[in-house]
């Protein structure tokens, strides 16, 4: 079971509270987790990744085990602590202002 923490605006869109728990078939990668997340919550399609390119949207970052995974390849394995469910994958929305 993989745990995912979404930013507040995406939790509201998906109508979830707190962490999301997902079953991921195969290796635990960013792509596999996001595929499972979008399959379970279709309203999130296009909000985390671009529809066509499947690249991370510019103002979102991925963190796990105190590491920024935002620039890791989408098929790179996630840390073991995330794959085992001990630690969550954090999807963080940027805060900007002027």
Annotate each language-model stretch with its function.
Residues 1-97:
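Ubiquitin-like/PB1-type beta-grasp interaction modules and other compact soluble beta-rich domains
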